Protein backbone atom coordinates (compact mmCIF):
# COMPACT_ATOMS: atom_id res chain seq x y z
CA UNK A 1 0.00 0.00 0.00
CA UNK A 2 1.35 3.36 -1.07
CA UNK A 3 1.37 6.03 1.54
CA UNK A 4 2.04 9.77 1.32
CA UNK A 5 3.44 11.85 4.07
CA UNK A 6 1.69 15.03 5.09
CA UNK A 7 4.71 17.03 3.94
CA UNK A 8 4.58 15.55 0.45
CA UNK A 9 0.86 16.24 0.15
CA UNK A 10 1.33 19.80 1.37
CA UNK A 11 4.23 20.37 -1.05
CA UNK A 12 2.16 19.06 -3.95
CA UNK A 13 -0.74 21.33 -3.01
CA UNK A 14 1.54 24.38 -2.79
CA UNK A 15 3.13 23.54 -6.15
CA UNK A 16 -0.30 23.18 -7.77
CA UNK A 17 -1.38 26.53 -6.30
CA UNK A 18 1.75 28.21 -7.63
CA UNK A 19 1.11 26.79 -11.10
CA UNK A 20 -2.50 27.97 -11.01
CA UNK A 21 -1.49 31.41 -9.80
CA UNK A 22 1.21 31.64 -12.45
CA UNK A 23 -1.27 30.69 -15.17
CA UNK A 24 -3.75 33.25 -13.90
CA UNK A 25 -1.07 35.93 -13.85
CA UNK A 26 0.02 35.04 -17.36
CA UNK A 27 -3.55 35.26 -18.61
CA UNK A 28 -4.04 38.57 -16.79
CA UNK A 29 -0.81 39.96 -18.21
CA UNK A 30 -1.73 38.79 -21.70
CA UNK A 31 -5.14 40.45 -21.44
CA UNK A 32 -3.58 43.63 -20.07
CA UNK A 33 -1.00 43.68 -22.86
CA UNK A 34 -3.73 43.09 -25.44
CA UNK A 35 -5.83 45.94 -24.04
CA UNK A 36 -2.83 48.26 -23.92
CA UNK A 37 -1.93 47.34 -27.48
CA UNK A 38 -5.50 48.04 -28.59
CA UNK A 39 -5.43 51.35 -26.75
CA UNK A 40 -2.10 52.24 -28.34
CA UNK A 41 -3.40 51.30 -31.77
CA UNK A 42 -6.51 53.37 -31.13
CA UNK A 43 -4.38 56.36 -30.16
CA UNK A 44 -2.22 55.86 -33.24
CA UNK A 45 -5.34 55.67 -35.37
CA UNK A 46 -6.69 58.88 -33.82
CA UNK A 47 -3.37 60.62 -34.40
CA UNK A 48 -3.26 59.37 -37.98
CA UNK A 49 -6.83 60.55 -38.61
CA UNK A 50 -6.04 63.92 -37.06
CA UNK A 51 -2.99 64.26 -39.23
CA UNK A 52 -4.97 63.18 -42.28
CA UNK A 53 -7.60 65.83 -41.61
CA UNK A 54 -4.87 68.38 -41.00
CA UNK A 55 -3.15 67.60 -44.29
CA UNK A 56 -3.76 70.03 -47.23
CA UNK A 57 -5.60 72.39 -44.85
CA UNK A 58 -2.64 74.21 -43.33
CA UNK A 59 -3.56 76.06 -40.13
CA UNK A 60 -7.25 75.30 -40.79
CA UNK A 61 -7.95 76.22 -37.18
CA UNK A 62 -7.22 79.82 -38.12
CA UNK A 63 -10.04 79.84 -40.66
CA UNK A 64 -12.77 81.84 -38.94
CA UNK A 65 -16.33 82.51 -40.04
CA UNK A 66 -15.74 80.91 -43.41
CA UNK A 67 -18.82 81.42 -45.56
CA UNK A 68 -19.33 78.44 -47.83
CA UNK A 69 -16.04 76.97 -46.63
CA UNK A 70 -17.08 73.70 -48.24
CA UNK A 71 -16.70 75.46 -51.59
CA UNK A 72 -13.18 76.49 -50.61
CA UNK A 73 -11.24 73.97 -52.64
CA UNK A 74 -10.33 74.19 -56.29
CA UNK A 75 -12.75 76.99 -56.93
CA UNK A 76 -12.24 78.74 -60.27
CA UNK A 77 -8.82 78.91 -61.92
CA UNK A 78 -7.17 80.23 -58.78
CA UNK A 79 -4.04 79.38 -56.81
CA UNK A 80 -1.86 80.21 -53.84
CA UNK A 81 -3.48 82.97 -51.80
CA UNK A 82 -1.60 83.26 -48.50
CA UNK A 83 -3.19 84.85 -45.43
CA UNK A 84 -6.19 86.10 -47.41
CA UNK A 85 -8.76 87.49 -44.96
CA UNK A 86 -12.38 88.36 -45.71
CA UNK A 87 -11.68 87.26 -49.24
CA UNK A 88 -14.49 86.94 -51.75
CA UNK A 89 -13.24 84.39 -54.23
CA UNK A 90 -9.79 84.76 -52.67
CA UNK A 91 -7.59 81.79 -53.92
CA UNK A 92 -6.12 78.92 -51.94
CA UNK A 93 -6.47 81.09 -48.88
CA UNK A 94 -4.03 80.30 -46.08
CA UNK A 95 -5.43 81.60 -42.77
CA UNK A 96 -8.45 82.84 -44.72
CA UNK A 97 -11.07 84.39 -42.42
CA UNK A 98 -14.62 85.13 -43.50
CA UNK A 99 -13.76 83.71 -46.88
CA UNK A 100 -16.55 83.35 -49.42
CA UNK A 101 -15.58 80.57 -51.82
CA UNK A 102 -12.10 81.24 -50.48
CA UNK A 103 -9.96 78.59 -52.08
CA UNK A 104 -8.59 78.49 -55.60
CA UNK A 105 -10.98 81.26 -56.35
CA UNK A 106 -11.42 83.17 -59.60
CA UNK A 107 -8.24 83.39 -61.64
CA UNK A 108 -6.58 84.34 -58.35
CA UNK A 109 -2.93 83.44 -58.00
CA UNK A 110 -0.05 84.25 -55.72
CA UNK A 111 -1.85 86.66 -53.41
CA UNK A 112 0.15 87.02 -50.20
CA UNK A 113 -1.57 88.45 -47.13
CA UNK A 114 -4.54 89.64 -49.19
CA UNK A 115 -7.23 91.00 -46.83
CA UNK A 116 -10.84 91.81 -47.68
CA UNK A 117 -9.99 90.95 -51.23
CA UNK A 118 -12.63 90.52 -53.90
CA UNK A 119 -10.99 88.21 -56.39
CA UNK A 120 -7.95 89.19 -54.35
CA UNK A 121 -5.37 86.69 -55.42
CA UNK A 122 -4.06 87.93 -58.67
CA UNK A 123 -7.12 90.01 -58.00
CA UNK A 124 -9.25 89.46 -61.03
CA UNK A 125 -6.34 89.31 -63.44
CA UNK A 126 -4.06 91.07 -60.92
CA UNK A 127 -0.52 89.73 -60.98
CA UNK A 128 1.52 89.11 -57.86
CA UNK A 129 -0.55 91.09 -55.37
CA UNK A 130 1.30 91.26 -52.04
CA UNK A 131 -0.76 92.33 -49.02
CA UNK A 132 -3.48 93.52 -51.41
CA UNK A 133 -6.63 94.41 -49.43
CA UNK A 134 -9.96 94.65 -51.24
CA UNK A 135 -7.98 94.75 -54.45
CA UNK A 136 -10.01 94.26 -57.61
CA UNK A 137 -7.95 94.28 -60.79
CA UNK A 138 -4.93 95.24 -58.67
CA UNK A 139 -1.74 94.40 -60.54
CA UNK A 140 1.53 93.91 -58.70
CA UNK A 141 -0.05 95.58 -55.68
CA UNK A 142 2.24 95.76 -52.67
CA UNK A 143 0.37 96.53 -49.43
CA UNK A 144 -2.57 97.87 -51.44
CA UNK A 145 -5.52 98.63 -49.14
CA UNK A 146 -9.15 98.67 -50.26
CA UNK A 147 -8.17 99.16 -53.87
CA UNK A 148 -11.08 98.40 -56.16
CA UNK A 149 -9.80 99.67 -59.49
CA UNK A 150 -8.09 102.06 -57.04
CA UNK A 151 -5.33 103.13 -59.34
CA UNK A 152 -7.91 104.98 -61.48
CA UNK A 153 -9.66 106.79 -58.65
CA UNK A 154 -9.25 110.26 -57.19
CA UNK A 155 -10.72 111.68 -54.01
CA UNK A 156 -12.76 114.28 -55.92
CA UNK A 157 -14.70 111.70 -57.90
CA UNK A 158 -18.37 111.91 -56.93
CA UNK A 159 -19.18 108.41 -58.13
CA UNK A 160 -20.47 106.40 -55.17
CA UNK A 161 -18.62 103.27 -56.26
CA UNK A 162 -15.26 105.02 -56.46
CA UNK A 163 -15.84 107.08 -53.32
CA UNK A 164 -16.42 103.83 -51.42
CA UNK A 165 -12.86 102.85 -52.25
CA UNK A 166 -11.40 106.37 -52.28
CA UNK A 167 -8.84 105.64 -49.61
CA UNK A 168 -6.99 103.58 -52.19
CA UNK A 169 -6.02 106.80 -53.97
CA UNK A 170 -2.89 107.38 -51.91
CA UNK A 171 -1.71 103.85 -52.57
CA UNK A 172 -2.60 103.73 -56.25
CA UNK A 173 -1.87 107.21 -57.58
CA UNK A 174 -1.41 107.99 -61.24
CA UNK A 175 2.38 107.92 -60.97
CA UNK A 176 2.28 104.41 -59.52
CA UNK A 177 -0.17 102.97 -62.06
CA UNK A 178 0.20 105.17 -65.11
CA UNK A 179 -1.24 104.57 -68.54
CA UNK A 180 1.82 102.59 -69.53
CA UNK A 181 1.06 100.11 -66.75
CA UNK A 182 -2.62 99.70 -67.62
CA UNK A 183 -2.65 100.71 -71.25
CA UNK A 184 -4.77 99.31 -74.00
CA UNK A 185 -2.40 96.41 -74.53
CA UNK A 186 -2.80 95.33 -70.91
CA UNK A 187 -6.58 95.61 -70.68
CA UNK A 188 -7.62 95.51 -74.31
CA UNK A 189 -10.76 93.94 -75.69
CA UNK A 190 -8.96 90.64 -76.13
CA UNK A 191 -8.18 90.58 -72.40
CA UNK A 192 -11.73 91.33 -71.27
CA UNK A 193 -13.69 90.22 -74.30
CA UNK A 194 -17.08 88.59 -74.35
CA UNK A 195 -15.64 85.09 -74.41
CA UNK A 196 -13.74 85.65 -71.17
CA UNK A 197 -16.41 87.59 -69.27
CA UNK A 198 -19.58 86.46 -70.93
CA UNK A 199 -23.00 86.29 -69.33
CA UNK A 200 -22.53 82.71 -68.19
CA UNK A 201 -19.27 83.54 -66.42
CA UNK A 202 -20.47 86.65 -64.60
CA UNK A 203 -24.21 86.29 -64.67
CA UNK A 204 -26.72 87.99 -62.37
CA UNK A 205 -26.53 85.27 -59.73
CA UNK A 206 -22.74 85.47 -59.50
CA UNK A 207 -22.23 89.23 -59.73
CA UNK A 208 -25.60 90.89 -59.30
CA UNK A 209 -26.38 94.51 -60.06
CA UNK A 210 -25.96 95.67 -56.48
CA UNK A 211 -22.44 94.25 -56.31
CA UNK A 212 -21.11 94.99 -59.77
CA UNK A 213 -23.50 97.24 -61.67
CA UNK A 214 -22.85 97.79 -65.32
CA UNK A 215 -21.88 101.46 -65.06
CA UNK A 216 -19.20 101.10 -62.39
CA UNK A 217 -17.71 97.64 -62.79
CA UNK A 218 -15.43 98.37 -65.74
CA UNK A 219 -15.65 102.16 -65.72
CA UNK A 220 -11.99 102.63 -66.56
CA UNK A 221 -12.25 100.33 -69.53
Curated annotation (Swiss-Prot):
Stretches for region 13 X 6 AA approximate tandem repeats of A-H-H-A-A-N: 69-146
Annotated stretches, region: Disordered: 52-141, 180-221
First and last residues of every Sequence repeat: 57-59, 60-62, 63-65, 66-68, 69-74, 75-80, 81-86, 87-92, 93-98, 99-104, 105-110, 111-116, 117-122, 123-128, 129-134, 135-140, 141-146, 176-180, 181-185, 186-190, 191-195, 196-200, 201-205, 206-210
Biased composition (Low complexity): 75-141
Compositionally biased residues, Basic and acidic residues: 52-67, 180-211
InterPro entries membership: Plasmodium_HRP
Region of interest: 4 X 3 AA approximate tandem repeats of A-H-H: 57-68
Region (7 X 5 AA tandem repeats of H-H-D-[DG]-A): 176-210
One Pfam family this sequence matches: Plasmodium_HRP
Protein known as: Small histidine-alanine-rich protein
Record organism: Plasmodium falciparum (isolate FC27 / Papua New Guinea)
Amino acid sequence: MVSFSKNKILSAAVFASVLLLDNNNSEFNNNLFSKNAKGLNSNKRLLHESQAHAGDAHHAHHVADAHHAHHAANAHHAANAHHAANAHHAANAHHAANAHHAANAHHAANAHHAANAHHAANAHHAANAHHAANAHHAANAHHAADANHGFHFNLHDNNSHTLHHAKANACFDDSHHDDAHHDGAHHDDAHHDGAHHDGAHHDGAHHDGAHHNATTHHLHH
